[in-house]
């Protein structure tokens, strides 16, 4: 079962790869519209993190951002666990991608803009609460 799971998540499934080839060959406006939509989502999410005072590299070509949460004083694991339990928002600890990921979280913007905005509000509330705890 583990091997099956590993092969399923290692790369895009063959059917998805063939679908991508077909989309490229028969390119139409929907691809450009989708690219613009994801660009807008990325910009909204990045601005949200910057407004919270979280440094965030401006990634291109992915569906994820990797903001720094070092200013909260929490480890990546603690931040993610508390955010999940306290605000019901799931993000991935940076340590899932190696030691250098400590102090960061990975956030997907492959959601609707409304869901992204809701999540950003909850993350902002959590970050403010954690910073206030540090100052008490």
Model-derived regions, located:
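PLP-dependent class I/II
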Residues: 1-136
């Amino acid at each position: 079962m583990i091997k099956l799971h590993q092969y399923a998540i290692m790369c895009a499934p063959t059917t998805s790869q063939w679908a991508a080839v077909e989309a490229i060959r028969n390119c139409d406006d929907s691809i450009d519209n989708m690219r613009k939509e994801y660009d807008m989502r990325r910009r909204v999410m990045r601005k949200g993190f910057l407004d919270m005072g979280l440094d965030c590299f401006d990634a291109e070509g992915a569906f994820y951002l990797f903001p720094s949460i070092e200013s909260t004083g929490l480890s990546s694991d603690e931040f993610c666990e508390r955010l999940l339990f306290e605000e019901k928002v799931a993000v991935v600890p940076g340590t899932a991608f190696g030691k250098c990921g400590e102090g960061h979280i990975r956030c997907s913007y492959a959601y609707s803009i409304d869901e992204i905005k809701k999540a950003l509000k909850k993350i902002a509330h959590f970050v403010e609460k954690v910073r206030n705890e540090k100052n008490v």
